[in-house]
């Protein structure tokens, strides 16, 4: 799975949203996800059902916004598992450039951001059945110049 993260159809010359979507549907990741997979993201992203739901509601917008990203420079350096559960994480775990408004709708800043992300997995029938993904969105937005806590305090 790790090697498949390096496949970036969104960076190909002439790539369109539809062509990237189709390549993600046909991406090697399909061999790792259970047909009834559930993906649970943080507030602002929500839950996705099935691979197509995951692609449409999280993966495609994320990849279109953060085309220039590096998983390995700082990386998911913690990997543990027990029985049917596993987890990866890092503090910070992804470095990326904010390049479009597809993810969360904020205008592109072209700022380099780091992301605090963890993935918790439930495996069933040899495939990933559920994936919980806490993403520190408040921290990402702060790096883009949006102080969510200050905005809440002002209300």
Write out the residue ranges for each language-model feature.
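C-terminal and inter-domain tail/linker signature
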Residues: 1-155
